[in-house]
Amino acid sequence: MLNGLPPLVSPQTRLLILGSFPGAASLAAQQYYGHPRNHFWPILQAIWPSSPEDICASSYQIRSEWLLSKGLGLWDVYAACEREGSLDSRIRSPVLNDLAGLKVLCPKLAAIAHNGGESFKHARHTEQLGLPVYRLPSTSPANASWSFERKLAAWREVFEKYGLI
């Protein structure tokens, strides 16, 4: 059984981005979106191009602090699972994270954005928080049917809606 990462949130988190479960590279590095070909950090860099530093080239600690300063948070729908490799289709025996406590950790939380289809399968679970829920295209390199530009446009739309940009 593999265990996921703890939530990366703060009391200032307004939009929580929920993935499914960290891939092998992310688990090994103990970092969200740690695979070098994942589009997550490049999308954020493109949304905030005037940031004082190159977020993609920064240390994980700096990226994490920067993300939190933007009102964003990260977590996954699965706390643990069995899986060989990194593909969501290989996830077996998943254990859901307890999302109910998020409102205490994040009193300003205004919405949940699911990063990809596997995460969005649990939208009914996140809707119980009484917040708007969005499905965003997966930033995974396995999601080759969406171009970077198309993913960027979809992500930007949700961030704009919540005044994060």
Predicted regions and their residues:
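Hydrophobic packing residues within well-ordered alpha-helices of enzyme cores
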Residues: 44, 122-123
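Short, solvent-exposed loop/turn segments at secondary-structure junctions
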Residues: 22-25, 39, 79-82, 118-121, ...
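Structural motif
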Residues: 14-15, 111
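C-terminal capping/extension of enzyme domains
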Residues: 1-14, 35-36, 87-100, 124-165
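Residue-level signal for well-ordered alpha-helical scaffold segments within enzymatic catalytic domains
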Residues: 42-46, 101, 105, 157
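Short, surface-exposed acidic-centric catalytic microdomains
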Residues: 25-90
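Internal catalytic-core helix/loop-beta-alpha segment
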Residues: 69-118
